[in-house]
C-alpha cells in the first residue's frame, strides 16, 4: 500500500517491517516521532528511557538477548550515549541493533549544530542516511540486515527536514526473524582490556569489509547526467541538487555515508570536468574525497553552517561556476515571502507554570543557571531571567562550581533551574555532587508533570509509561532527601508570594536546598482552566506591570491592557501584579 508519511513515521514503519521487537529512546526534536509511531505497533515493545545512555544500553541488552532492537535520540543525545556506543562497536551484536540520531542543521530546537557523522567515523560503525520517507523505511530494514551480517550496531542519521517532511512510502508486511539464541561468550561481550585488545582487530577488519560492501551496495547510486559535471551528495542536499539541476549533471547519491565507497567515488570522478560535494554542516565527504586525491569543490563555495536550500545552492553555485549558472536557469525564490512573514519568536504559553517563578527570580535579581526545556524560554524578554544554558543537567553541576568559585558572594543570589524530566535525565548526579561536596547551592526543580518541550512525553516522575498506562513513579521530594538534601520545599508557581518567600529563605540558608516548583503544564488535557480574565478599562492606568510577565494573552492597545480570551487560561498571575485591580474574572 502506498501512503504519504512523515520521515519519522516511515522509519518507525521500517522498524515494524524489519522485525524490530524492542524500542528504547529518549525524546528530543527532531527524533521524537519515531518512537511515538513505533509504539502503535503491538508487536514492538516501546519505552521512554530516563536518558539516551540508558536507552542505548537497554537496546543493546535486547540485542544481546537475540532480538532486533532500536534506540532513538537527537544529535546531542548521542553525546550522552557515546560511552556505550564506542564499546558496543567492539562487542558487536547478536540481534540487529539500530541507533537513530537526528541532526538539526540551523538549530531549529537545539543548543548546537554538531554533525553526527563524526561519531560513526570515530566509533567505526556503519551509518546510513535516508533522503526521503521511502528511504527512511527501506534503510531501517537494510540496517538490520547489515547489523547482523557484519556484527555491528548501525546508525541511521536523520535530519530535521527528512524527519519532518512527507513523501510516498510503499508499505509492506512484517518480517519475523527468529530470536537468535543467546550464547555466553566472554571474549566477545566482556570488555576487559585483554578482551578489548583482541576485539579491536575485528573492528578494523569489519570496517574494511563494510567499505567493500559500500562500493557495490544499492544504498549508493549513480544518476547519469548530460554534462561532464559530477555532484556527490546525500540526504536533504540530494533533493535540492535534483530540483536545481534535473538531469543536467551526474549525481552520486550516497545512502551509506560511513564507510564511504572509495572505488565508487574514484570511478564516478573519471571524466568529470567539474566535481562538487554538496553536504550540510561539516565537509566529511569532501575531506574523504580529497584524501583520495580527487579535486573537488565544496566548502570553498558553500557554507559550513546552517541549512541549505535550492535558492541558496543556486545562488552560491551560479556565482562560483558560470557553467552551472547556465544549467540552473531561474529558480522561483521563496525569500520574498520569508521576508514578509512577521517573526514569531518562541514564548512560554499562556498560563505556563514557569512564568510566575521566573518573574520572582527576575524581581529578586537572581543569577539563574538554566537547563534544557520549555523553561529555557525564561531567558527571553521581558523576563530575561536565565544567565546560562549549556546542556542537559548542566545547571545543577554548574551552580556547584559557580558557588565554589565565588563563595558567599554568589550563594545568596544564585539558583539553578531544571525541569522534572531533565532532572531525571542527568540532574541527579549533579545534586549528589552538591550534597557530597557540600556547596551552599539552591536548586529549583520545575515540575510540570510532563516532558513538555518535545511534545508531552511521560517520564519517571509522572507515574505513566509511553502508552499512558500506570507505571512506577519517582517521588522527587523523597529522592532529593535520600540524596542528602535536608531542605526540600514545594511551592505553587501561581502563588507569587509563596515563591518569593521560598526563594528568599533558601538563598539565605547555609546548606544545600531544593525548591520544587510544582504545577502541571497548562496544555495537559486533564488540566482544568478558569474563565479568561478581563480588563476593567476604567481601572486600568496603563502602567504595563502586567506586561512584565511576557504572557502572549496580554497586549497593549492604545494605552490600555487587553486580554485575548482565546489564549487566557485564568491563571491569575497577572492580576497579582496589577495594583489598580484592573484585571479580574468576569462578574455577572
Over which residues does each language-model region extend?
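Flexible, low-complexity linker and terminal segments
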Residues: 1-8, 17, 130-348, 353-354, ...
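Thiamine diphosphate
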Residues: 1-133, 161, 224-225, 248, 379-516, 526-527, ...
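Short acidic, glycine/serine/threonine-rich loops at helix termini
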Residues: 34-37, 60, 81-85, 107-114, ...
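Short helix-loop-beta junction
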Residues: 37-43, 242-251, 478-484
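A glycine-rich helix N-cap at a beta->alpha junction
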Residues: 43-50, 91-102, 182-187, 436-449, ...
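Conserved thiamine diphosphate
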Residues: 104-153, 159, 191-194, 410-412, ...
Amino acid at each position: 500500500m502506498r501512503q504519504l508519511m512523515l520521515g519519522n513515521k516511515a522509519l518507525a514503519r521500517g522498524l515494524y517491517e524489519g522485525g524490530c521487537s524492542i524500542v528504547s529512546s529518549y525524546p528530543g526534536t527532531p527524533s521524537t516521532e519515531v518512537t511515538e509511531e513505533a509504539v502503535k505497533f503491538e508487536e514492538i515493545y516501546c519505552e521512554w528511557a530516563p536518558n539516551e545512555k540508558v536507552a542505548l544500553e537497554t537496546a543493546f541488552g535486547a540485542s544481546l538477548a537475540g532480538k532486533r532492537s532500536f534506540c532513538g535520540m537527537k544529535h546531542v543525545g548521542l553525546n550522552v550515549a557515546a560511552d556505550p556506543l564506542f564499546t558496543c562497536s567492539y562487542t558487536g551484536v547478536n540481534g540487529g541493533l539500530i541507533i537513530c540520531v537526528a541532526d538539526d542543521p540551523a538549530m531549529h530546537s537545539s543548543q548546537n549544530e554538531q554533525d553526527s557523522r563524526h561519531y560513526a567515523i570515530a566509533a567505526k560503525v556503519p551509518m546510513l542516511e535516508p533522503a526521503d520517507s521511502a528511504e527512511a523505511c527501506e534503510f531501517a530494514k537494510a540496517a538490520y540486515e547489515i547489523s547482523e551480517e557484519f556484527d555491528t550496531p548501525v546508525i541511521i542519521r536523520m535530519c530535521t527536514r527528512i524527519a519532518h517532511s512527507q513523501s510516498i512510502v510503499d508499505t509492506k508486511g512484517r518480517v519475523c526473524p527468529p530470536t537468535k539464541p543467546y550464547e555466553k561468550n566472554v571474549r566477545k561481550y566482556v570488555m576487559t582490556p585483554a578482551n578489548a585488545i583482541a576485539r579491536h582487530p575485528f573492528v578494523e577488519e569489519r570496517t574494511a569489509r563494510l567499505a567493500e560492501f559500500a562500493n557495490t551496495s544499492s544504498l549508493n547510486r549513480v544518476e547519469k547526467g548530460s554534462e561532464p559535471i559530477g555532484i556527490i551528495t546525500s540526504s536533504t542536499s540530494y533533493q535540492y541538487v535534483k530540483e536545481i539541476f534535473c538531469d543536467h549533471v551526474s549525481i552520486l547519491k550516497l545512502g551509506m555515508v560511513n564507510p564511504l565507497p572509495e572505488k565508487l567515488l574514484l570511478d564516478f570522478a573519471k571524466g568529470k570536468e567539474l566535481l562538487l560535494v554538496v553536504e550540510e554542516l561539516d565537509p566529511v565527504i569532501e575531506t574523504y574525497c580529497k584524501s583520495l586525491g580527487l579535486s573537488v569543490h565544496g566548502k570553498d563555495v558553500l557554507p559550513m553552517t546552517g541549512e541549505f536550500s535550492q535558492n541558496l545552492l543556486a545562488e552560491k553555485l551560479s556565482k562560483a561556476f558560470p557553467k552551472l549558472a547556465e544549467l540552473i536557469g531561474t529558480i522561483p525564490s521563496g525569500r520574498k515571502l520569508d521576508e514578509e512573514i512577521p517573526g514569531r519568536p518562541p514564548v512560554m504559553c499562556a498560563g505556563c507554570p514557569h512564568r510566575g517563578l521566573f518573574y520572582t527570580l527576575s524581581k529578586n535579581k537572581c543569577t539563574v543557571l538554566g537547563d534544557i526545556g520549555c523553561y529555557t524560554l525564561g531567558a527571553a524578554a521581558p523576563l530575561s531571567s536565565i544567565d546560562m544554558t549549556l546542556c542537559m543537567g548542566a545547571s545543577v553541576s554548574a551552580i556547584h562550581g559557580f558557588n565554589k568559585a565565588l563563595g558567599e558572594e554568589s550563594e545568596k543570589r544564585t539558583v539553578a533551574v531544571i525541569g522534572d524530566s531533565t532532572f531525571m535525565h542527568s540532574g541527579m548526579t549533579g545534586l549528589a555532587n552538591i550534597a557530597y561536596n557540600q556547596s551552599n547551592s539552591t536548586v529549583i526543580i520545575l515540575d510540570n508533570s510532563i516532558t513538555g518541550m518535545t511534545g508531552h512525553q511521560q517520564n519517571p516522575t509522572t507515574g505513566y509509561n509511553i502508552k499512558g498506562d500506570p507505571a512506577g513513579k519517582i517521588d522527587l521530594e523523597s529522592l532529593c532527601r535520600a540524596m542528602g538534601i535536608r531542605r526540600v520545599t514545594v511551592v505553587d508557581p501561581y502563588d507569587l508570594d509563596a515563591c518569593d518567600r521560598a526563594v528568599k529563605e533558601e538563598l539565605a540558608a547555609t546548606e544545600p536546598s531544593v525548591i520544587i516548583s510544582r504545577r502541571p503544564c497548562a496544555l495537559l488535557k486533564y488540566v482544568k482552566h478558569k474563565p479568561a480574565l478581563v480588563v476593567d478599562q476604567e481601572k486600568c492606568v496603563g502602567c504595563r506591570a502586567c506586561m512584565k510577565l511576557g504572557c502572549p494573552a496580554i497586549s497593549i492597545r492604545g494605552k490600555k491592557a487587553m486580554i485575548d480570551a482565546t489564549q487566557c487560561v485564568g491563571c491569575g498571575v497577572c492580576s497579582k501584579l496589577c495594583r489598580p485591580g484592573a484585571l479580574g474574572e468576569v462578574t455577572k
